[in-house]
Amino acid sequence: MQYVKTYLSTAPVLAAIWFAILAGLLIEINRFFPDALILPYV
């Protein structure tokens, strides 16, 4: 039961860290390459 409590307490923390890193990465990509969702050569 101790391992279940440990897992439930660390998984949300790891998910929050991962989503924060991913959001920062997407923000920086959009800063250097704006409007990447639009295909300009079509």
Swiss-Prot record:
GO CC annotations, alphabetized: chloroplast thylakoid membrane; photosystem I
Transmembrane residue ranges: 7-27
Source organism, top-level taxon: Eukaryota
Gene3D superfamilies: Single helix bin
Record InterPro entries: PSI_PsaJ, PSI_PsaJ_sf
UniProt-annotated location(s): Plastid, Chloroplast thylakoid membrane
GO terms under biological process: photosynthesis
Topology versus the membrane: Single-pass membrane protein
Keyword ATP-binding annotated: no
Keywords from the named record: Chloroplast, Membrane, Photosynthesis, Photosystem I, Plastid, Thylakoid, Transmembrane, Transmembrane helix
Role played: May help in the organization of the PsaE and PsaF subunits.
Family note: Belongs to the PsaJ family.
Protein name (Swiss-Prot/TrEMBL): Photosystem I reaction center subunit IX
Species in which this protein is naturally found: Zygnema circumcarinatum
Higher taxonomy: Eukaryota, Viridiplantae, Streptophyta, Zygnematophyceae, Zygnematophycidae
Gene: psaJ
